[in-house]
Amino acid sequence: MRDMVTSHVVTASDRPSAGRAEDRSGPLLAEWLAGRGHTVERVVVPDGEPVAQAVRRAVEAGAELVLTTGGTGVTPRDRTPEVVAPLLCVEIPGIIEQVRAVGAAKGVAGAPLTRGVAGLVEGEHGRTVVITLPGSTGGVRDAIGVLDPLLDHLLDQVRGGDH
């Protein structure tokens, strides 16, 4: 596996994107990825089409991994799954299923309400792993727990590595 992985973290949240609140989940993801040796770029955008635009820009820039946080719930403004799902050429539903299961096992009543999606987006530089995660810091910590032992293998597989 290559030493340096380029990752993008996209926070989907109306208040932080307008400067009216602090983004707490994006920095958690960025810190975790940087600790794994990734080069990390971060952006905060309003939910909806700006999320899809940020994901497309990351793919076009050659990112190997894009993690979004926020916009996966059931409020009228939560649109991240709807705008990211059409970009996927391959779905990987087990990742989000596991994140939900971890939250539910901890007794988080709202864990089943996250509607995240995960998969691959085809770009001119190859395929990019895109995973849409909850916006809460607890949901992000659960996701990190799921992804930490899996991420190197996942990225290697996407690059064409063996099982």
Spans of model-derived segments:
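Non-catalytic beta/alpha edge segments that cap or flank active sites
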Residues: M1-H163
